Amino acid sequence: MMKNLNGRAHNVCYQPYYQQQLQHQQLHQQQHQQQQQQQQQQQHLQQQQLQLQLPYAAQYNQLQQQQLQYNQQQYYQQQLQQQQQQQQQQQLLRQQQPTQSAYQQQNAKQSYGHNNNNNSNNNANMARSNMHATTVAAVNANGNSHANAANANTATAAMAAMCQMQSFLSQQQQQQRQQQQQQQQQYSNNSAHINYNQQQQQSQQQQQSQQQQQSQQQQQSQQQQQQHLPTVATTNGDKLTLDSANEIANFLANELFMQQLVTFDGMQSAPTLTTPTLTPTTLRTIEDTIYELTTDSHVPFQAGFKPPPLTSLGNITNNNTITSTTAGGATLPGINANLINTNPQFDLIALNCAGSVPGSDTEESNGSWNEGQLNDDQSTTDTSSAATDSTSYQNGGHMMGNGSNGGVNNFAAALSGVNTSGRGSGLAANSTTSNSATPARRGGGRRPNKAANMSPEEEEKRRIRRERNKLAAARCRKRRVDQTNELTEEVDALMKKSEDLKKEIESLTATKSQLEYVLQTHSSTCQKVRDDLLTVATCNGLIGPTTLLNACNTSSVSLHNSNNSNNNSNSNDSSNGTITGFDATLNSTGRSNSPLDLKPVLIDEQLLQHIKHEPQDGAIDSGSSLDQDGPTPAKRFALPNIATFNASLQTPTGPAAGAALNTPISSTAPSSFAHFSSAISSPTLNAHALNKLPKPRPNTLNVNAQRPFGVAAAAGDGKAPPTQIQGVPIQTPSTGTFNFDSLMDGGTGLTPVSGPLMPTCSSQNKHPLELPTPTSEPSKLVSL
């Protein structure tokens, strides 16, 4: 035993070589057709010969046609009997479940019987030919009025041969029947299970054998009468009368009828005890041979094993309602009542097929199916595969297919139309669902957990609960789909927004890079310079007083350099644009290329009016800051004109020539600073103009037009040196001439040259407010 894909057990011998068996069957059918054609041709030739020789050809033709019709009727009856026997044998096989060896023995017996049948057919053909030859000889002998004794002797010999041949055929048929009975008894003894159905079948077979024996006895008596009549006619030796012709025709008809009793293709032959060599073509089962003759060779549903055929028996309406007729207390789905009445043997077969077969391979799968279960299972969607598997081999293979619908729905309609009341239930009809059945699903779904003792109320509750579960699952799926769609839409909106932001960022970045490029290209050709780039607080190229410079630097630093908390700038630092002590041309040439600030610097013209004048102590020779190399910031002012200076300069000529010069401190600004405010108002110089057209150093001393001090003194023109310069009185006790060394030793010509001064605490702390000013840095310039 093996298990197929659905898990059901089936015999190994059912489908070993199905295609080869089909081919073998087709070959047998072709051979049978050829034999029939040969027989018909021989009969046709014999008829032609008889028509040429016999004067009563028309009557013979009529008799021959009647004989052919009778033979056809007999053939159809034999076919029906064969089908009934095949169905009985199939039922026996399903009940007994024989093993492979039993099937092989049955096949061997059947093949041996087939050989015997072929031999009997050959003998019958030879006998028939001999009989025809004897009849022709008898006709020739009796038809001629001038026949001699030799012809009469040949006729008698022919009749004797015919009698011997008929006796031989009858003996051979009796031997075959005896062998069949013995083999059937042996087969029944070998089988392990004999039920009531087998006993009924044996009784039916015995009745059939008795009927056949009676018919054979009648035929033998008729043959003997036919044998005596021609002999009498031949002994008389005269012409053949109409009575003798009728007798000959009857003899031929009986002979053909006896030939029809011979089996065809070994279907009625019983198995023998001998076992020939098994080949793939001879290894087949009785069930296969039955299906080959009764069903179509092209089964539409094959899944690795041979399924039962979907034969439509009876009336099938369009709405898949299957009519059923009751016979013997059991329900027979789709069987016509006329067939049951005309064929009494078919009742037993139908009863056996309608009921469940004990001991079959589908008994365990049929145990969980009750009446009304199929419709309940079809109302749900999770039991389609199980229903297909468990009912595909139920009720002896008789399944009802839908005649109006083809294709896949035939199988589902057949499943839905199977009558499940074969265990004795008296249901009259079984209506199935609509044609919307789908093919079975392999895998998935729930197994049918149907209890045998479940009440209809429990089944209804289960159905309602399943319907509610289905609706709840559908709502859950819909809710999940809606939530997924909402989230998807939200994600799409956010993605779109992010893309818009990215595009905006890209556009702004491109605009920024474009503006930077334009700014870079414009900075090299821009004509505007920052106002405080080269701003110098100078008066005709020289630095003004300390108080004025402090005010200017404080205002410029507070406007442009807010990070400098001390407002302290170096005199040589060119970063703030203010240069102390240098010429503007020198500052412009030594300045680095820094970014331009185009903001204008506004300086109030009234700034000079708020300059605080601090008193100076005449006792201190040096400035307030002792660590400076140059003079004090208060003494950094523009020198007056040399001409006026020489006129007002008074140099005493005495031994005190090396004394320090005492320069009086004026409380008012010199007259040369009158135009300082105008110079302050426009202090910014154009860098490009300075670079391209160098401005000559401003000449504020007018040394070219005037004579120096020493020349004026040496000239001796009798004029006294000037005592004041532009309103500033000059009182110098020194009368000596200062050379370069004396000027570079620390004096500027305006202060008395004396020994080195030691710093004191009073000199350091006397003017603390001047320290954070830009002019408190030591000056590195030398006044000439």
Curated annotation (Swiss-Prot):
Q: Reply yes or no: does the keyword Oxidoreductase apply.
A: no
Highest taxon of the source? Eukaryota
The record places domain bZIP at 459-522
Residue ranges for the region (Leucine-zipper) are: 464-471
User: Does the keyword section mention Glycoprotein?
Assistant: no
GO molecular function annotation: DNA binding; DNA-binding transcription factor activity, RNA polymerase II-specific; RNA polymerase II cis-regulatory region sequence-specific DNA binding
Where is this protein chiefly located?
nucleus
One GO-annotated biological process of the protein: embryo development ending in birth or egg hatching
Positions modified as Phosphoserine? 594
User: What GO CC annotations are associated with the protein?
Assistant: nucleus
Region (Disordered) residue ranges read 97-126, 196-231, 358-404, 421-464, 616-635, 759-784
Give the Low complexity compositional bias ranges: 97-106, 115-126, 198-227, 380-397
The UniProt keyword set, sorted, is: Activator, DNA-binding, Nucleus, Phosphoprotein, Transcription, Transcription regulation
Biased segments, Polar residues type: 365-378, 421-438
A Pfam family of the record is bZIP_1
Localization, UniProt = Nucleus
Binding partners and assembly: Homodimer. Heterodimer with Jra. The kay-Jra heterodimer binds more stably to the AP-1 site than either of the two proteins alone.
Per the similarity annotation, which family is this?
Belongs to the bZIP family. Fos subfamily.
> What does the protein in this record do?
Developmentally regulated transcription factor AP-1 binds and recognizes the enhancer DNA sequence: 5'-TGA[CG]TCA-3'. May play a role in the function or determination of a particular subset of cells in the developing embryo. It is able to carry out its function either independently of or in conjunction with Jra.
This protein's name:
Transcription factor kayak
What is this protein's gene name?
A: kay
